[in-house]
């Protein structure tokens, strides 16, 4: 499964047993909704998830500042269509200063959009009801199309951020992002507090949609929060807005999460509606990196089944659909060209995977946005980075121990083999945009073959297997000094460079020069030479 699954934790999914079942069915990221969580829950949830699977990420969704009504006598206010209401007298907001940005003719929505008003005058500030309804204490207020200055985070958010950093969560989601400065403000606070978490911007206002191009540049990921976005926009516009947000995010290398009412019927029912399956399918085809469950997994009756449903639909769609690459990428053109080369090479040779060796994650992000047919394995020495990259479409973490600067190509291959994800003979495209990985230099793309790795050099000729010899009885001659007793061998392995005259005499043979071996090849040992990559392996019985 390439599409990732995000699930909100709540009473229905807070036990280790249920969480393990959800993870076993494909859960990649656990969401803590700070609006309904206690700050003490962060440490408890983090420890539980890490004890089950250390590759699963954790996100704290910050509530952020909200615009709401005050309280009413008796707890409610009946609204009559056509009637005028004076703000500050009939209806009070928790921040009356925001009205300075509102003009005559603007619409104001209250109670999650159920009650609509139009501004009649600003002195006194009077609004006219456009429909009947009832307002309750602290009803949500939206003012579509206007930038509303509410600040970025609250004191409560700051407390959650500090706790999240202390517990090592991986993501912070920022609510009601309207401009890039909101994201920058949160990131500054995270860095000043000692954190390096990825920032997910929730697009749920018209201002956020209008400023999406600048927001993606400041963000690591984008959440299409269709609930509030569907209040601020006419419902007919939400689907195309979703497509526009996803496309814009991918052009900048940001991952995307589609959220709200993904499988809402499964809060109470064990199976989804046909419309929900259609919605999920189209979100995947739109190139969403992840789909998010909210009430379905937090308070629903069937949290495991909801995750399983997303997995089943994702598996089917991914098997049937060819995904479009990002045709334009607004980033480092050299690194993007390397990523594109890795994708094209992988698709052409039908590789079993792309191993992207990364320190910052940028190479992995770009390759993921190109939607290669093979899975992308994010090989990194940072466990935290591995979890962050696990949210990207088609990416799986491959955590390696040690210092990146000290890892040789052979050591990297050993980690790949020990991961158990690849059988002997698997073809891998290996790429790095980072200079300290020493398997070929900066911005490199190579093909490697998985097996019992012995060494690697510069190869010419066909792939073959045979018995190694340091004398005359064997198929593959081993030479440490560049000398040979004759040319009647099928292949030659030199641990040094050789003279052009000798190379010319071996034309038509398989030759490996400057071979670097991780161990001594024994006399009579059967080995395999990959003529395309120069990799030397222990030969399996079926290799010829």
From Swiss-Prot:
Gene3D superfamilies on file: Phosphoenolpyruvate-binding domains, PK beta-barrel domain-like, Pyruvate kinase, C-terminal domain
Residues that bind K(+): 33, 61
Binding site for substrate: 31, 227-228, 260
Originating species: Thermoplasma acidophilum (strain ATCC 25905 / DSM 1728 / JCM 9062 / NBRC 15155 / AMRC-C165)
Cofactor dependence: Mg(2+); K(+)
InterPro entries: Pyr_Knase, Pyrv/PenolPyrv_kinase-like_dom, Pyrv_kinase-like_dom_sf, Pyrv_Knase-like_insert_dom_sf, Pyrv_Knase_brl, Pyrv_Knase_C, Pyrv_Knase_C_sf, Pyrv_Knase_insert_dom_sf
Top-level EC class as recorded in UniProt: transferase
GO terms for MF: ATP binding; kinase activity; magnesium ion binding; potassium ion binding; pyruvate kinase activity
EC code(s) of this entry: 2.7.1.40
Family label: Belongs to the pyruvate kinase family.
Protein known as: Pyruvate kinase
Sequence positions that bind Mg(2+): 204, 228
Catalytic activities: pyruvate + ATP = phosphoenolpyruvate + ADP + H(+)
Annotated positions binding ATP: 33-36, 68
Subunit structure: Homotetramer.
Coiled-coil stretches noted in the UniProt entry, renumbered to this chain: none
Site residues, Transition state stabilizer: 202
Keywords, comma-separated and alphabetical: ATP-binding, Glycolysis, Kinase, Magnesium, Metal-binding, Nucleotide-binding, Potassium, Pyruvate, Transferase
